[in-house]
């Protein structure tokens, strides 16, 4: 009974979070309610069941052969890709429908609405109650047209997650397309050391009042931090840092006055921070040596000056790209892209059991209208014995376009200059629009 009630609560919550759009004016009203200090991007899905996932990740055969797809396309039409960087090549492939790790976005809310309304029907086979296909007298399968509800997803992306098309971080993610399907990496102790640094900074902030009376002579009296703390101590729980510092003062400076002890703690925290940063750098080099050799080679094909080290955080990121406006379609659609990295494989998990080149997730806080897959917690990852990874989704308020209103909205958008002929400058698309018009 509890399970049924829980499911009913979930369904009710999902329904409450849906806003059905019936006209352009209703849509503009909803969009105008959004308040954010970040950059707003839109994506229109003609089918509300679609996920924020690039084409190459929609079928396993694509991600398994991503490196082959990339090279095959260039080998067939090399003149179209001559002189282009990897990200420029991926953008051109995306333009022609090749599966890539890019996902189209737009900065124009009406353009996204157009794409959400682009298709209103889908054809499906008719199914009998026993699950078999319905057929006619000749034994041919019967089909029916089903309405498709669309959706506009709205993202609010911070400046630090937006990069120009020629940035080093974009080059890192773009060149993942050249890596084989068995590419994976582990962060080893990198994540722990990063968290440790954050905790040390918090402790420094708590003791910042003693900076004004900072005694440089007192600092000179301290030995290297290695004389007070072992490498094993760096893998203590972060909340034990304060106790560790107090123990060092008690054991090594028992005769110091209270004021000096407080200053000594701050000095020790500074030394601890520097030591942790050094360990973090060594850990980063280790990860590069073990996992990123081929990736670095591919990046240097684009950027010969690229440093011989890759930040693991960048490999597992998602970035919005400030596109190069060298394509009439991108210009007309006010388009840009998300580019997706690859998530790390956790230490306790066999990489062979993980999905191929596991996709990095869009941070849930970016999505302000729509649904988004959220990170599975560490315990669930380690205890999930299923061959299929479990999916958790955060449902936020969704802008749903019912199939019955799509045609009406398309006509309204056309009056505002948003139609197939204005968004797609190619002659065949203009011809399609004119045929539909008459």
Question: PLM features: residue spans?
Answer:
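Catalytic-core elements of nucleic-acid end-processing and repair enzymes
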Residues: 1-438
């Amino acid at each position: 009974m509890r399970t049924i009630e829980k499911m009913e609560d979930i369904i009710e919550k999902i329904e409450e979070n849906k806003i059905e759009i019936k006209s352009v004016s209703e849509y503009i009203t909803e969009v105008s309610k959004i308040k954010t200090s970040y950059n707003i991007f839109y994506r229109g899905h003609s089918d509300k069941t679609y996920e924020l996932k690039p084409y190459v990740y929609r079928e396993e055969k694509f991600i398994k052969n991503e490196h082959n797809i990339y090279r095959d396309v260039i080998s067939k039409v090399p003149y179209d890709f001559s002189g282009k960087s990897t990200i420029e090549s991926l953008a051109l492939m995306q333009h022609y429908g090749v599966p890539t790790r890019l996902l189209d976005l737009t900065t124009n809310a009406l353009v996204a609405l157009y794409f959400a309304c682009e298709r209103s029907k889908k054809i499906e086979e008719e199914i009998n109650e026993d699950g078999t296909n319905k057929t006619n007298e000749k034994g041919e399968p019967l089909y029916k047209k089903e309405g498709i509800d669309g959706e506009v997803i709205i993202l609010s992306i911070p400046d630090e997650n937006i990069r120009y098309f020629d940035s080093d971080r974009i080059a890192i993610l773009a060149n993942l397309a050249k890596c084989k399907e068995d590419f994976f990496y582990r962060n080893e102790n990198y994540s722990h050391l990063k968290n440790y640094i954050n905790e040390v900074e918090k402790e420094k902030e708590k003791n910042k009042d003693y900076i004004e009376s900072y005694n440089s002579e007192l600092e000179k009296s301290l030995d290297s931090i290695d004389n007070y703390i072992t490498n094993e101590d760096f893998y203590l729980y972060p909340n034990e840092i304060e106790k560790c510092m107090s123990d060092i003062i008690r054991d090594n400076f028992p005769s110091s006055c209270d004021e000096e002890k407080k200053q000594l703690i701050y000095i020790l925290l500074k030394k601890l921070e520097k030591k942790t940063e050094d360990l973090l750098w060594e850990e980063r080099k280790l990860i590069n040596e073990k996992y990123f050799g081929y990736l670095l080679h591919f990046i240097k094909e684009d950027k010969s000056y690229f440093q011989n080290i890759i930040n693991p955080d960048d490999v597992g990121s998602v970035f919005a790209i400030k596109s190069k406006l060298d394509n009439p379609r991108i210009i007309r659609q006010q388009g840009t892209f998300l580019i997706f990295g690859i998530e790390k494989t956790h230490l306790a998990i066999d990489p062979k059991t993980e999905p191929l080149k596991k996709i990095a997730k869009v941070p849930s806080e970016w999505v302000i209208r729509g649904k988004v897959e959220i990170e599975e917690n560490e315990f669930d990852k380690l205890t999930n014995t299923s061959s299929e990874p479990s999916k958790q989704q955060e449902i936020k308020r969704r802008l749903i376009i019912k199939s019955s209103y799509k045609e009406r909205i398309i006509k309204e958008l056309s009056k505002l200059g948003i139609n197939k002929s204005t968004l797609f400058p190619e002659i065949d698309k203009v011809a399609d629009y004119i045929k539909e018009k008459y």
